[in-house]
Amino acid sequence: MALARANSPQEALLWALNDLEENSFKTLKFHLRDVTQFHLARGELESLSQVDLASKLISMYGAQEAVRVVSRSLLAMNLMELVDYLNQVCLNDYREIYREHVRCLEERQDWGVNSSHNKLLLMATSSSGGRRSPSCSDLEQELDPVDVETLFAPEAESYSTPPIVVMQGSAGTGKTTLVKKLVQDWSKGKLYPGQFDYVFYVSCREVVLLPKCDLPNLICWCCGDDQAPVTEILRQPGRLLFILDGYDELQKSSRAECVLHILMRRREVPCSLLITTRPPALQSLEPMLGERRHVLVLGFSEEERETYFSSCFTDKEQLKNALEFVQNNAVLYKACQVPGICWVVCSWLKKKMARGQEVSETPSNSTDIFTAYVSTFLPTDGNGDSSELTRHKVLKSLCSLAAEGMRHQRLLFEEEVLRKHGLDGPSLTAFLNCIDYRAGLGIKKFYSFRHISFQEFFYAMSFLVKEDQSQQGEATHKEVAKLVDPENHEEVTLSLQFLFDMLKTEGTLSLGLKFCFRIAPSVRQDLKHFKEQIEAIKYKRSWDLEFSLYDSKIKKLTQGIQMKDVILNVQHLDEKKSDKKKSVSVTSSFSSGKVQSPFLGNDKSTRKQKKASNGKSRGAEEPAPGVRNRRLASREKGHMEMNDKEDGGVEEQEDEEGQTLKKDGEMIDKMNG
């Protein structure tokens, strides 16, 4: 049998029916009585010719579904050649339907914080670096740049096909925007032509909304079509690419997690995978994967930073002023390497300029940057004047919402939840995104923070805005214990980084002034213990750095240094020396000391740290003579000093309110606050 190539499902259906012998055609009608949705009467079917039957089915179901209905009946008759013919026609036609669906999504896509399509720096690495942050581990090796176009090139790696690519990067580096742009480019034929029949984007944050999460429903959800031809789509798994975006945001112990884990192990569907994640989640992700390729997302180059500013500031004078302000602040300029933080900085400066306000803040770390943004965008009263009562109420409500989400692994919130916290979603677009989710015939609204970084910032703030010690409660102490428990996290989370910055003396004073609240003395006492607990573990863990060090020459910093027990800190000192040279100080430190909190007891981490406190720096060779830092526009040579500190140089210091606080005298990292 030689069936002609059909140009449409209608044509294919007619060809298949005409190819049947008379007895086979009668048998088909018999099967159609049972499989058709409206149960056609026997007499009605018997009188229909091939053309009439095709027309009747198409009018009842539409061309695509009519082909599927006939295909199921032919399968029952074991006419496999005709089944394969119809399935292939259906699949070929549905590919274009799906591409059109993806292209239409772009028009109503909310790209979130990282809405720019600027090119990002991608570096290929042979491994993830185990449990360490890529910012540290990959300094020890030469990183090769990689393009999105070559991520799945057959010659890219010697790994078995289909390939797995793990794309890792700190919060805000642009992973989500990058993969959404990848899907759009594929749908337009610009990327991977002829390589993938389908590229499915799965948000690990939003997949929990699926009422029934299994693989067929997941594919239908991706297609935006409850009647998607799942069986035909899965027939060639090697031509499928699933993009699992934000593995670190996947809700634990959920049905969605189970389904995605099955997909990652690729036993049932051996497809290509692209998984994006923040580094802390790699420890749980990697055991499920076989051979894979690791790519680091490192944010903007210098050129792309300026391009991004140009897209944000259309007024030339504002653009000039914004660039000058950022370039004159080494911390801000470095921070703007991260697209998410660059968006925060641009939005903050633009709002200040629109109000005609002078920018008096000088951020010294990422916490200061988020603080400046939040204090600028907190709502005003009806007259346009800032109302301390309104601002403080909204701040507390945002903090309580963020804390509830973090406690329950929740990143999406229904409107009722916002109302419970006294928040009005539409009026808080500076902090919240709205997502329209189709539930049956209706639309249900969900809200999320504009970026996970905002939720973690407000979560850290929630420890400070409580009005008295009773509000801290046992639950709060358990939360802090969980944050600092070394068994739970090999890396310091972003929430913990924010909290550590806030608990510094100058940090708490600054927050109180900006947000017009005073930290209650009893709460301050609790926070002191939290700070001591964080300091006890900060030397033992790697930090999930927001500002990735991508310059290949920076790897010289680790030459001759054993990174297992030594903590490496980079400081830019003497910025205003007359010779204009930027000194670079590298300090190694070992953890020591035992901190006891009345709420947390003798933490396991302190016992482990005491054992390590007697160590010595191993194999310290003479460091590289200089490091070029193109991100800070410096071509000068630096120098490095290696200093071993037994206890990190903790000193006692009195703050303005007479509270005894501990301050790290040697380990202050100017680049990360």
Swiss-Prot record:
Disulfide bonds: none annotated. It is a peripheral membrane protein. CDD domains: Pyrin_ASC-like (cd08321). Residues 633-648, 659-673 have a biased composition (Basic and acidic residues). One of its GO terms (molecular function) is ATP binding. ATP binds at G169, S170, A171, G172, T173, G174, K175, T176. InterPro entries: DAPIN, DEATH-like_dom_sf, NACHT_NTPase, NLRP_innate_immun_reg, NOD1/2_WH, P-loop_NTPase. Coiled coil: none annotated. Residues 649-658 have a biased composition (Acidic residues). Keywords: Adaptive immunity, ATP-binding, Cell membrane, Cytoplasm, Immunity, Inflammatory response, Innate immunity, Membrane, Nucleotide-binding. GO terms for biological process: activation of innate immune response; adaptive immune response; defense response to fungus; inflammatory response; innate immune response; positive regulation of defense response to bacterium; positive regulation of inflammatory response; positive regulation of interleukin-1 alpha production. Residues 584-597 have a biased composition (Low complexity). Its main location: cytoplasm. Belongs to the NLRP family. Inhibits autoprocessing of CASP1, CASP1-dependent IL1B secretion, PYCARD aggregation and PYCARD-mediated apoptosis but not apoptosis induced by FAS or BID. Displays anti-inflammatory activity. Required for immunity against C.albicans infection. Involved in the innate immune response by contributing to pro-inflammatory cytokine release in response to invasive bacterial infection. Contributes to T-cell-mediated inflammatory responses in the skin. The pyrin and ATP-binding domains are required to elicit cytokine release following bacterial infection. The NACHT domain is required for inhibition of CASP1 autoprocessing. This is NACHT, LRR and PYD domains-containing protein 10. It comes from Mus musculus. The lineage of its organism: Eukaryota, Metazoa, Chordata, Craniata, Vertebrata.
